[in-house]
């Protein structure tokens, strides 16, 4: 894979507690693994959630905010902290990070904004930088209300013609039933076509820290695969699994591109 995009859900960055504090060990392992993959010749793009969750931790709020102004204030504080952490960790491995905060209209249309984003991304990769992308949560209301870095990451992957998109969250992959209700539900290792039957499996599994569930991940798969980009849904508890995912090994659920 030449260009690999990786989405990190909020639950990857933040400890699953009311405090919204950073999961330092997991973030360190993630950045080390991505740095090593970059050293091995893969272009890496990171789409990272976690600004709101990190912000309410830093603001010492007792729980995730529910009203829009507090969410957006949390995002403003948390985004600084998030980038500080990524900059610090990637710098240890001699990689330079670049922050890109975008909203859906920036990359949704075929106009000059999308072309501008594409050109900037191309140049950053040429210069050897590692782009870290998030929705611009302080001005973007729809994303926070609906919660959709899954779709954002797929649009980014499609825009830059990525070869692989990996969605890391607290979900192991796509199951043929709800594993929380049905212990016999089986993981589906590969999906060749994201059809109505597959979409129907995307009920509504979500995590407490983030805002996206399986339904948005399947929408992301449609966008990515439609643009010729393979996609994998995997559990990010062990970021080192990225080595096996990039090597094509059966981890999580892989959505294949028709060649």
Which ranges hold each PLM region?
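Short catalytic helix/loop segments, enriched in acidic residues and glycine
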Residues: 20-35
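Short beta-strand segments at enzyme active-site cores
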Residues: 43-55, 98-99, 132-134, 167-171, ...
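Ligand-binding beta-strand-loop-alpha-helix segment within the catalytic cores
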Residues: 64-140
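Acidic, metal-binding active-site segment of PIN/NYN-like and related structure-specific nucleases
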Residues: 158-184, 230-241
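Active-site loop ensemble at the mouth of alpha/beta enzyme cores that anchors a bound cofactor
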Residues: 240-259
């Amino acid at each position: 894979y030449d260009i690999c995009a990786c989405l990190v859900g909020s639950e990857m960055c933040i400890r699953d507690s009311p405090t919204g504090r950073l999961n330092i060990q997991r973030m360190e392992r993630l950045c080390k693994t991505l740095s090593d993959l970059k050293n091995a010749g893969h272009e890496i793009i990171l789409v990272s959630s976690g600004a709101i969750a990190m912000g309410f931790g830093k603001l010492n709020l007792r729980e995730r905010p529910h009203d829009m102004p507090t969410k957006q204030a949390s995002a403003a504080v948390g985004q600084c902290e998030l980038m500080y952490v990524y900059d610090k960790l990637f710098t240890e491995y001699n990689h330079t990070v670049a922050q890109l905060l975008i909203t859906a209209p920036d990359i949704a249309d075929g106009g000059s904004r999308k072309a501008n984003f594409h050109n900037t991304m191309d140049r950053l990769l040429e210069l050897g930088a590692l782009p870290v992308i998030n929705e611009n949560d302080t001005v973007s209301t729809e994303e926070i209300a609906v919660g959709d870095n899954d779709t954002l990451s797929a649009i980014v992957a499609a825009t830059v013609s990525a070869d692989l998109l990996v969605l890391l969250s607290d979900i192991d992959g796509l199951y043929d039933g709800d594993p929380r209700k049905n212990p016999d539900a089986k993981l589906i290792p590969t999906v060749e076509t994201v059809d109505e039957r597959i979409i129907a499996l995307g009920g509504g599994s979500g995590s407490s820290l983030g805002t996206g569930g399986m339904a948005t991940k399947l929408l992301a798969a449609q966008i990515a695969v439609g643009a010729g980009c393979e996609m994998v849904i995997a559990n990010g508890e062990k970021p080192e699994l990225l080595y096996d995912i990039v090597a094509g090994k059966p981890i999580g659920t892989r959505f294949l591109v028709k060649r």
